[in-house]
Structures are given as structure tokens and as C-alpha cells.
UniProtKB/Swiss-Prot annotation:
Its cofactor is Mg(2+). Its main location: secreted. PANTHER family: ADP-DEPENDENT GLUCOKINASE. This is ADP-dependent glucokinase. The active site is at D481. Pfam families: ADP_PFK_GK (PF04587). It catalyses: D-glucose + ADP = D-glucose 6-phosphate + AMP + H(+). Binds 1 Mg(2+) ion per subunit. Its EC number is 2.7.1.147. Residues 52-497 form the ADPK domain. It is found in: Secreted. It comes from Bos taurus.
Length: 497
């Protein structure tokens, strides 16, 4: 009986300690281990997530992410900036009296019906997209409903402003932002962001961000992933009005890194305007002192001719680095007749070998080489499940840390946490993959303890890492911009650039 009673007491105490452990995981591990061992019940259980693949991967990243030897001091960013009005896409469309019909992509939106069809199309795929709304009055009516929506939130928007805001979080960096900055945006910007007076305007540019969650339903429609649909009637950014202000500000600011974005905003313009403006973009970039790297951040596009012109009309050779996602990468290949261009869209997680082939083609056909007058030597690719940094050998350093840092910020920003909470993230990357689909690539099996995989192909180095995908993302907008900014922050360019 005494033996039974002692066993029962030990059992109850073990149960109690287990409950304490589950309910109060923040208690010091030493206190829990001491209590557990005093009961002589063997080794204490590991805290949640520590031994999981997600926990091991997060710990491995932390060990790999180190600042480069040579760091940026002054970063200039331009030229698109706006105020993002973020709210539930389904709730807004319901408030507008719309119902989900058959989804259909529209390269440009002209009506509420076009908006409903395009939103349904992309929500059904769980894919991000950005479209221009041509009707000024209809857009302002929708924008007013969205802005006054009880759950609507206002944030810094526009790739340039978001990238500048991310850089500004580092107090040892000085950040210049050129773009159409109205009163609301100026109020939202970090104090560390300097806006030249010529960039200030009386009225803000508003972009509407319609978000949806993974598994969210609207009648028969169900989103496979959390994502967003963006639309605007943005004339200032659409004309890249701040380009000349941006370039003229560089001489006084003396940056050692320039980040350019906003080319996609020209989709609502005429072909003649696009061609003329792109030539002016190239001329402006050529005025930037030699040795100052220029990163171009691409964004969602539907105009193949505009994308083809960006690729071929000297824009790619003029920049040093590119940032883009899976939609932009495939569209780029389709527009310029690159590899796998017959692929109409991605089916689920983009195939690593296919992505690698397209990145290799961009750098081989349009990148820096002895026989080509091009500065392009780096591409930072990001998709929901993984990231790849591809670089021409001999021009960039610390890319292992850079790709890991970009993936880490994707997890923390999506979940709105300071550090990775392993209970709120999961691995979505393929467990194994081929490094190429066109050549005899290697087969790679993921190891969470060594999360960055490196391979080489004819003078191009690839750094791959999976992403810890947030299960319940708080905000998806600006993730790509944060990823690119963080990757650049940890990158080092060789002086002979």
C-alpha cells in the first residue's frame, strides 16, 4: 500500500509539473529541470519547438547570420511611396455589395466587377497580385469605403518607402527616401528617414491592400494560402514623377547603396510614355557614380511588352542587383523567351530546379561578364516556402548570411514577432529537390541543422534556404521589400564592382 501510495504521489506530482511546463513555458528552464529531477523521474522534457525541425533551423540561422566586414553607411531609396490601406478583401467586397463569381484575371481594372473577378481569381490561387484601377471616380468611391472601414489600418506603403523604413530600423544607417510623400505618409515614416523637401506633396497616394487568410472562405471560394490583392489609381507613382528629384538628391547625399523601385507602376501609361521614361531611368542610373551598387526591386506586372523593354532596353545591365518573387520571375522569362517560358503558372510551391534555371539564364544572358557591358551580378529570389540568392562569382560576399537573414525576417515580420516563435511557423519547402531541370543538376535533401544549401554553375553561385512560414500571418504586405532590404543589409559588395 505504501509503495502504491508513493507511486501515486509521484504520478500526481509529475502530472502537476507537466501542467506547469505547458502552461508556463516561460519559466526558467533550470527551475523546471530542478523540480523534475527532484522527483527522480528521469530527464526533463524539452521545451516546445527546441528539438523540432523548425527550432533547429531557426537556431542554425542565428549562428549563420553575421554582419559583413564592409557595411553600408548611407542608403538612398526611391521612387514609389504611398499610404497602404489594409483590410479584409472579402469584407470590403461584401460591403460593396459584390458576390464571388467566376474568377478572371484583368491586366487593368475598369470597374467594381473587374475588381471582384480579379480578386476571386488570385484568392483562389493564394497568389499575390497588383493592378491599376483606371476609373478615377470609382476608385475614390471604393477608397473612401475602405478608409472608413472600422478594421482598416493605415501603413507606410510603396516598395521604396517600405525598403527605406526597413533600413531605417538600423540606427547606424542614414536613409534618404524620394517619392510622393503626403502628410499621412510623412507622419508614418521613421524619424531616421530623410525626405527632401522636393518630395513632399499636399495629398497622399493611397493603395488598397485586400488581405485574405489561409483557408479563408467566401461562398465556394477557399484561399490555399494567406496573401493579398493590391490596387490603386496612382498617377504620381505611375509616372515616376520623383525620379529626377531622386537622382538630383544623390550628389549631396553621397550614398554607398542605391535602391530603385516603382517601374511596375508605369503599367497604366501608354507604350510611348513607358519607352521614353525607361530611357530616362537608364540615363539617370548611369549618372550614379561608378562603384555605387544599384538594386532594382521588381513587383507584380502583367504587361509583357513593358517587362521585355525593362529587360532589353538596358535597364537590367544598368543595375547591379535584382529582387523579385515567383510571379515576377516566371513573367520575366515568358516576356523575354527565357527557359521554362511555356509554363503558364506555378502549381503549388515553385520547383527549385526551374527557378534556378531561370535565375542562371538571367545572369548568363543579361549579367556581368568580360564580354558584356553589364553591372548585373546578383538576384535575390523569394517565394513563400524558400529563397535563393544567385550571384556572379567574385562580386559579392556574405551571401550565406544574407539569404538566411532574408528568410528569418520573412518569418518574424509575417508573425509580427521579434524572434521566431517555432510554435507559429512551419516548413513548407520541398524535403528534397533538383538544382536544375535543364542540366544534370544535383539532388539536395534538406537538413534543418544546415539550412543554407550552396551550389555552383558556370561562374554563378546559388544560396538556397527554406522559409519558416507563419501559420497565422498578421500582415503579408511588404514582406518582399523587407526580405530584399534585409538581404542587402547583410550583403557586402567587392570594391572592384
Amino acid at each position: 500500500m505504501a509503495l502504491w501510495r508513493g507511486s501515486a504521489y509521484a504520478g500526481f506530482l509529475a502530472l502537476a509539473v507537466g501542467c506547469v511546463f505547458l502552461l508556463e513555458p516561460q519559466l526558467p528552464g533550470s527551475a523546471l529541470r530542478s523540480l523534475w529531477s527532484s522527483l527522480q523521474l528521469g530527464p526533463a522534457p524539452a521545451p516546445p519547438g527546441v528539438g523540432s525541425p523548425e527550432g533547429r533551423l531557426a537556431a542554425a540561422w542565428d549562428a549563420l547570420i553575421v554582419r559583413p566586414a564592409r557595411r553600408w553607411r548611407r542608403v538612398a531609396v526611391g521612387v514609389n511611396a504611398c499610404v497602404d490601406v489594409v483590410l479584409s478583401g472579402v469584407k470590403l467586397l461584401q460591403a460593396l455589395g459584390l458576390s464571388p463569381g467566376n474568377g478572371k484575371d484583368h491586366s487593368e481594372l475598369h470597374s467594381r466587377n473587374d475588381l471582384e473577378e480579379a480578386f476571386v481569381h488570385f484568392m483562389g490561387k493564394g497568389a499575390a497580385a497588383e493592378r491599376f484601377f483606371s476609373d478615377k471616380e470609382t476608385f475614390h468611391d471604393i477608397a473612401q469605403v475602405a478608409s472608413e472601414f472600422p478594421e482598416a489600418q493605415h501603413y507606410v506603403g510603396g516598395n521604396a518607402a517600405l525598403i527605406g523604413q526597413k533600413f531605417a530600423a538600423n540606427s547606424d544607417l542614414k536613409v534618404l527616401l524620394c517619392g510622393p510623400v503626403g502628410p499621412k505618409l510623412h507622419e508614418l515614416l521613421d524619424d531616421n528617414v530623410f525626405v527632401p523637401p522636393e518630395s513632399l506633396q499636399e495629398v497622399d497616394e493611397f493603395h488598397l491592400i485586400l488581405e485574405y487568410q489561409a483557408g479563408e472562405e467566401w461562398d465556394q471560394l477557399k484561399a490555399p494560402h494567406a496573401n493579398r490583392f493590391i490596387f490603386s489609381h496612382d498617377l504620381s507613382n505611375g509616372a515616376m514623377n520623383m525620379l529626377e528629384v531622386f537622382v538630383s538628391s544623390l550628389e549631396e547625399f553621397q550614398p554607398d547603396l542605391v535602391v530603385l523601385s516603382g517601374l511596375h507602376m508605369m503599367e497604366g501609361q501608354s507604350k510611348e510614355f513607358q519607352r521614353k521614361r525607361l530611357l530616362e531611368v537608364v540615363t539617370s542610373i548611369s549618372d550614379i557614380p561608378t562603384g555605387v551598387p544599384v538594386h532594382l526591386e521588381l513587383a507584380s506586372m502583367t504587361n509583357k511588352e513593358l517587362m521585355s523593354t525593362i529587360v532589353h532596353q538596358q535597364v537590367f545591365p544598368a543595375v547591379t542587383s535584382l529582387g523579385l518573387n515567383e510571379q515576377e520571375l516566371l513573367f520575366l522569362s515568358q516576356s523575354a523567351s527565357g527557359p521554362h517560358s511555356s509554363l503558364s503558372s506555378w502549381n503549388g510551391v515553385p520547383d527549385v530546379g526551374v527557378v534556378s534555371d531561370i535565375l542562371f539564364w538571367i545572369l548568363k544572358e543579361h549579367g556581368k561578364s568580360e564580354s558584356r557591358a553589364s553591372d548585373l551580378s546578383r538576384i535575390h529570389f523569394h517565394t513563400l516556402a524558400y529563397h535563393i540568392l544567385a550571384t556572379v562569382d567574385g562580386h559579392w560576399a556574405n551571401q550565406l548570411a544574407a539569404v538566411a537573414a532574408g528568410a528569418r525576417v520573412a518569418a518574424t515580420q509575417a508573425c509580427a514577432t521579434e524572434t521566431i516563435d517555432t510554435r507559429r511557423v512551419s516548413l513548407k519547402a520541398p524535403h528534397e529537390f533538383m538544382t536544375s531541370r535543364l542540366e544534370a543538376g544535383s539532388r539536395v535533401v534538406l537538413n534543418p541543422n544546415e539550412p543554407v544549401v550552396e551550389w555552383h554553375r558556370e561562374g554563378v553561385s546559388f544560396h538556397f534556404t527554406p522559409v519558416l512560414v507563419c501559420k497565422d500571418p498578421v500582415r503579408t504586405v511588404g514582406l518582399g521589400d523587407a526580405i530584399s532590404a534585409e538581404g542587402l543589409f547583410y550583403s557586402e559588395v567587392h570594391p572592384h564592382l
